[in-house]
């Protein structure tokens, strides 16, 4: 059914977002992904989404400012 397909896709998306946030935080803090993973797993879905939005928002702003120069 559509409901089970949606839940499956949503769970996969959440897993991918957690992996991305762990990778970004590890790079920022200079730690391994495994060390940061526990911190990311403890975060709420809302916090993870905010990290994703802020990361891509910064990238978009940097690209926009480069194109305006």
Curated annotation (Swiss-Prot):
Expressed by the venom gland. It comes from the Eukaryota. GO terms for molecular function: toxin activity. Signal peptide: none annotated. Keywords: Antibiotic, Antimicrobial, Secreted, Toxin. GO terms for cellular component: extracellular region. GO terms for biological process: defense response to bacterium. Belongs to the cationic peptide 06 (cytoinsectotoxin) family. Both the N-terminus (1-33) and the C-terminus (38-69) of the mature peptide form alpha-helices which probably disrupt target cell membranes. The linker region (34-37) probably derives from a processing quadruplet motif (PQM), found in propeptides of many zodatoxins, hinting at a fusion of two originally separate membrane-active peptides. Insecticidal and antimicrobial peptide. Has insecticidal activity against larvae of flesh fly S.carnaria. Has antibacterial activity against Gram-positive bacterium B.subtilis B-501 (MIC=1.25 uM) and Gram-negative bacterium E.coli DH5alpha (MIC=2.5 uM). This is Cytoinsectotoxin-2a.
């Amino acid at each position: 059914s559509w409901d089970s397909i949606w839940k499956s896709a949503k769970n996969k998306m959440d897993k991918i977002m957690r992996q991305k946030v762990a990778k970004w935080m590890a790079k920022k803090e200079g730690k391994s992904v495994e060390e940061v993973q526990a911190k990311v797993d403890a975060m709420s879905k809302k916090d993870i989404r905010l990290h994703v939005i802020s990361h891509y928002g910064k990238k978009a702003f940097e690209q926009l400012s480069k194109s305006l120069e």
